Amino acid sequence: MDRIIYEQSYAAISELYEIAKLREGSIVVIGCSTSEVVGSTIGTNSSFETAGEIFKGLYDFAKSKGIYLAIQCCEHLNRAIITERAALPFAEIVNVVPQPKAGGSLATQAYAGFEEPVALEEIKADAGLDIGFTLIGMHLKKVAVPVRLKNNKIGSATVLAARTRAKYIGGARAMYNEEQ
């Protein structure tokens, strides 16, 4: 099962990367309920081992493309973000070290696995994966656009995805760059 979780995680972020047209330096916010991944209700059966496989799949892909992960903590840490300092080198950090029952298993794995992890109260990511209905919208740039993935399951959890685009301004006579 571990290899399957790794592969599903890798496939989901890979598909999002292509659809969202992410590029080097982009940030992808990840919300994850490992309880949902293992077939339980969110918040009831956290799995540190499952989180490890998810993190490896996501991080291996992210490193290969030069993008950054921003892992959303659970509500006990007010949905703070764990990311790498290089993603936002001048951001104001907060002092917390996530734990499986205070921050979540994936955030804990990320804190241990990132090269130079930092915690932030908030972030504005370019795209996002919501694994198991964790609600990541507060950490996406405006304007969020839903993305339907073919790879929409990790274990038993439903995977929802979003990309972002620049706001359209200017009204009826304005011209827009569809690549943004």
State where each predicted segment sits:
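Glycine-rich, aromatic-bearing surface loops/beta-hairpins
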Residues: T108, A112-Q180
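Glycine-rich beta-strand-to-loop/alpha-helix junction loops that act as flexible
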Residues: I30-S35, Q72
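N-terminal glycine-/serine-/threonine-rich phosphate-binding loop
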Residues: M1-V28, F48-F61
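Generic secondary-structure signature for well-ordered alpha-helical cores
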Residues: S14, E18-K21, Y59-I67, Y111-A119, ...
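Solvent-exposed alpha-helices and their adjacent loops that cap or buttress functional pockets
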Residues: A20-L22, A102, R148-K153
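Ligand-binding beta-strand-loop-alpha-helix segment within the catalytic cores
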Residues: K65-A127, G132
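Active-site histidine-anchored catalytic micro-motif
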Residues: V38-I42, S46-E53, G57-R79, A102
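Structural motif
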Residues: V28-G31, L160
